[in-house]
Design a protein with these regions (language model features):
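Helix-loop element at the rim of GNAT/NAT acetyltransferase active sites that forms part
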Residues: 16-30
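Glycine-rich phosphate/pyrophosphate-binding loop shared by adenosine-nucleotide-utilizing enzymes
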Residues: 2, 52-57, 73
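A short beta-loop-alpha structural element at the N-terminal edge
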Residues: 1-15
Length: 140
């Protein structure tokens, strides 16, 4: 059974494993811990669990944006364990985040995903999101 819970420090290792799985690399654990510390203080983090195993997580940022004349929620990260794909975990996390954002008074929700993640694009469309913007990046 999968349940949604708010982030706890005991969730760090499970989320670390999912981030490495998503990016197909092994990140430095100390550096990742520092990133976690920042995320904990500045974002809302929701996780899904099956017994004690973390099956997915979502990081949500809420900011005031002048061009929306209000608060906007942004899904900074959404990841579901490969072993738990196609079980509605991503949909549950996304719906939970949308409900939370509405309760916080957000007027919009934004999500950015890499162009190569075609499955993610289909997922977001199925869940009612529209592809309306371009995002430009430059590695520093």
């Amino acid at each position: 059974m999968v349940i949604l819970v708010n982030f706890r420090l005991t969730s760090l290792e499970g989320i670390y494993q999912l981030v490495c799985q998503l990016e197909k690399t092994v990140f430095d654990q100390e550096a990742m811990y520092e990133v976690f510390q920042h995320a904990i203080l500045n974002h809302s983090i929701f996780i899904s669990k099956d017994n004690d195993r973390i099956t997915g997580y979502l990081v949500l940022s809420i900011t005031y944006q002048m061009h929306h004349c209000g608060k906007v929620a942004e899904v900074v990260e959404l990841c579901v364990d490969n072993d738990f794909q196609n079980q509605k975990i991503g949909t549950d996390l996304l719906n939970h985040a949308m409900t939370y954002a509405k309760l916080q008074g957000c007027v919009n929700m934004d999500i950015t995903t890499n162009q190569k993640r075609k499955d993610a694009h289909r997922f977001y469309r199925r869940n009612g999101l529209n592809n309306t913007h371009y995002k430009f990046t430059k590695q520093l």
